[in-house]
Regions:
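Mid-to-C-terminal alpha-helical segments outside catalytic/metal-binding sites
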Residues: 20-81, 92-134, 163-170, 192-196, ...
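Histidine/acidic-residue-rich catalytic or RNA/ligand-binding cores of hydrolases
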Residues: 93-96, 249-257, 300-315, 342-347, ...
Length: 407
């Protein structure tokens, strides 16, 4: 009898597993077509929809009907209370689209770092090792910009990335939230995706690349996007991730990196962070959209080094107002080895310690290196024990406010 119950439960589960995929895929496709997006331009669409469906089915979670205004739930899974704001999802289907980080689908020349294998269970294991209870997932470079110059595929890829991220966040609500990918430089489509990701899928912010098809974030055509975001109501969080410095020369995309001896993520990503935040400053994008807060990767990369250089020589009129913004609406993640020495350069600008956040860059930085980085934070003499605890487990609460509901 017991055996019989077990069999019928298994059969039922199999039937459900068979029935549910179609409906999730249908729902995703019908919302995409409602928003003018043709997902079928990606020839891997069926695999991607199957992967997203599998994510929901792992724990029998429903596809979101409407997440509007629902604050995401954040728990502490009892493994420490550390919050990771710089963490990447890298599902197998995405590694097929973009095998190299910083490269793109048509560029298998090894110019980027080969994207590491990743899955939810290895990510959860990693979190357990470090004592991280919650991670905000985003896709790393090239994110939705894997098909340079191809609007339809960029827009479709952004949508599917966001559906996949929402599936992780829905399925593991105590462990994950997400930053949505945006199909810039296509501003109108990015505004549509922004509203969908934030209002319907429940993204806690957006992840922008340092440049989108060679355009830095202060680019004129992006202003309506900043306007739309700032006008969504309440605080908006923009996480910026460095990417390859793309130049379009004579209709050909080339990475503007004359130094090819090490991969672009090592040095160019720091330069990229500097370029785009200088651009956001000089165009006064950061001045004009006052609801918008920025998370800077790697405690700003090479950006802090450039501040005096640029704003004490040219555009001196922006110096004080910019520093004021860097000290209030800018937040600085610790990802990769930043607390051995680099942190001193940032803090020299009187950046409040309450704006320091913890980030890992997993899976691009291994658990062993992350542990060493963690130790360097703990050994850093410039922060008190309380300030270190806040960096790891509290400052993000001030950043996200009512976007996250703390258990
Ligand atoms: C997840 O990734 C880890 C590390 O790459 C691997 O050992 C493991 O087999 C993977 N698990 C699944 C379910 O794919
Ligand atoms: C651009 O392409 C045209 C036509 O192929 C060629 O004549 C020209 O030299 C190219 N310019 C550069 C800068 O490569
Ligand atoms: C911000 O406002 C200033 C005027 O105060 C204007 O000159 C500048 O172009 C604006 N920049 C953006 C990106 O809106």
């Amino acid at each position: 009898m017991k055996f019989g119950v077990l069999v019928s439960a298994t059969v039922l589960a199999a039937r459900l597993a068979h029935a549910v995929p179609t409906s999730i895929a249908d729902a995703i496709m019908s919302r995409a077509s409602r928003d003018g997006i043709d997902l079928s331009v990606l020839d891997t669409m069926p695999d991607i929809l199957a992967a997203i469906t599998d994510t929901y089915n792992e724990r029998g979670v429903q596809y979101p009907q409407d997440d509007r205004k629902k604050a995401a739930r954040v728990g502490s899974r009892g493994v420490g209370n550390i919050f990771d704001i710089h963490a990447h999802a890298e599902p197998d289907w995405y590694r097929k689209v973009a095998p190299f980080t910083g490269g793109n689908a048509d560029r298998n020349d090894g110019g980027g770092t080969p994207s590491p294998a990743w899955n939810v269970s290895s990510h959860l294991d990693f979190m357990q090792t470090i004592g991280i209870s919650h991670s905000i997932l985003g896709f790393t470079s090239p994110s939705a910009n894997a098909f340079l110059g191809d609007k339809e595929r960029t827009v479709a890829l952004a949508r599917l990335i966001n559906e996949q991220l929402a599936a992780y966040a829905r399925t593991y609500p105590d462990s994950f939230n997400f930053f949505a990918a945006m199909p810039l430089p296509y501003t109108d489509e990015a505004i549509t995706e922004l509203k969908y990701a934030v209002q319907e899928l429940g993204a806690v912010g957006v992840a922008l690349m340092s440049n989108h098809e060679g355009h830095y974030l202060g680019y004129d055509s992006f202003t309506p996007f900043w306007q739309a975001m700032d006008g969504l109501g309440g605080r908006q969080v923009v996480y910026v991730h460095p990417t390859t410095p793309w130049l379009n020369v004579n209709e050909t995309w080339i990475p503007a990196n004359p130094y090819s001896d090490i991969d672009e993520s090592r040095m160019e990503f720091y330069m990229e962070t500097a370029r785009t935040f200088i651009d956001l400053t000089l165009t006064q994008t950061i001045h004009n959209f006052t609801n918008t807060h920025f998370v800077l990767p790697h405690i700003g990369g090479a950006f802090p080094t450039m501040i005096d250089r640029v704003l004490k020589t040219v555009h001196t009129e922006l110096y004080e107002s910019s520093l004021e913004i860097y000290r209030t609406r800018f937040w600085w993640d610790s990802a990769s080895p930043t607390y051995f020495h680099q942190i001193n350069g940032l803090l020299a600008y009187d950046i409040p310690k309450a704006n320091l956040l913890y980030g890992t860059d997993y899976p691009f930085i291994s658990a062993a290196v992350t542990a060493a980085d963690f130790d360097s934070i703990m050994a850093y003499p410039g922060l008190s024990d309380e300030e270190k605890e806040d960096l790891l487990s509290n400052n993000y609460k001030t950043l996200f406010g009512d976007k996250l509901h703390f258990q």
